[in-house]
Amino acid sequence: MRYSIEKITTLIGARRIGEAEANVSWLLTDSRSLCFPEETLFFALRSGRNDGHNYIPELYRRGVRNFVVERGRFRLAADTQFERANFLEVVSPLEALQRLAERHRDEFDVPIVGITGSNGKTMVKEWLYQLLSPQKVVTRSPKSYNSQIGVPLSVWLLGEQTEVGLFEAGISQPGEMQALRDIIQPTIGVLTSLGGAHQENFRSMDEKCQEKLSLFHDAKVVAYNSDDNVVSRCMRKSGYRGEKLSWSKEDPQAAMFIKKIERRESISTLYYIYKGKEGTYHLPFIDDASVECSIAAAVVALYLGVTPEELDVRMSQLEPVAMRLEVKEGQHGCTIINDSYNSDINSLDIALDFMSRRPEQQGKSRTLILSDIYQSGMMPQELYHRVMELAVKRRVNKF
């Protein structure tokens, strides 16, 4: 989706310096990922080790004309070297990025799945994508984009064709989830598991669990493991009033009761009862982590309309998440970047960006081997034009 620079100025409450007409389709926080400069809005973020304002002259030379800067931090905005550029001054570029993503999210009335937990977020998200994408256009977080910066960049990917959104939310200390909740606004919540990650920043496991559950305050339904005593206790204390979509190996009253799990060689067979109806699915993994993540993905997929028969077929075909952006050394000094597990336009851009950033690839010929991209929601002519644009921008030599 495109937004005019005038509308963005209003949405983030900025003071605009510059009067150049512009439309924005891409948000950028890392100068190395620049692809479409003429439609890019750069947010000059500051951290303890870096300052995005230092990259503005370089990005301007590369064609970027729209920048969000910290008020009083960048004093060259009126300089003639930045002709026909727009500078949007705000108190905090990070908060402006989050606010813009929040306003963008407001435009969509589709199921949005928010996924949080100490472990398994990415696996549940990616497997849900595989379970849902054969029949729905799914927009999801790239890689593990679950931070205060990654979440708004992910939500910005929501487009007119999106039918379901899948977004991760990760926190490391109290108070961080509020901003992510406002951006994602999940209609469906998934709590994967609790673990010791970042526990040093919380007084207790209960406090960490409550912080994570706060993501789902306004969700219509929350999926969680009711066998986890901490999670069950925190759910009761939270006062959550929506539908509780629990899964359990112990409680037959759970929304999804796992009756039995059989493990043979490399396949697990799970026998379950979902809302009173029995079903079975076969999973091509036997480790505990994969089995647990499959249950979380299954209960949400069933809730979203995947039939038990479809679930079994798609579960049996699940690919390991580790296949994402697999790098292999080929013959004659070439490097192979395999992203065949993913097949959508955003993943293609990420893979090409990954290729262009690798130091050993500088100066080498770049070849793109691509199958068709299904479930994009685009007309073929629009899709192939978009692929061609990406290939040209990322300097692919052979296609």
What feature does the model see in each segment?
Residues 48-50, 321, 340-399:
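Active-site beta-alpha connecting loops in nucleotide-dependent enzymes
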Residues 8, 40, 59, 100, ...:
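Residue-level signal for inorganic ion chemistry
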Residues 97-100, 128, 132, 154-155, ...:
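Buried hydrophobic packing segments
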Residues 1-99, 376, 389-390, 394, ...:
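N-terminal leader/targeting and accessory segments in enzymes
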Residues 75-77, 83, 190-335, 357, ...:
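Acidic, Mg2+-coordinating active-site environments of NTP-dependent enzymes
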Residues 56, 177, 212, 352, ...:
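Generic hydrophobic/aromatic pocket-lining and core-packing "Φ" positions
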Residues 33-44, 138, 149, 153-165, ...:
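Mobile, glycine- and charge-enriched loop segments
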Residues 95-242:
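Phosphate-binding loop of NTP-binding sites
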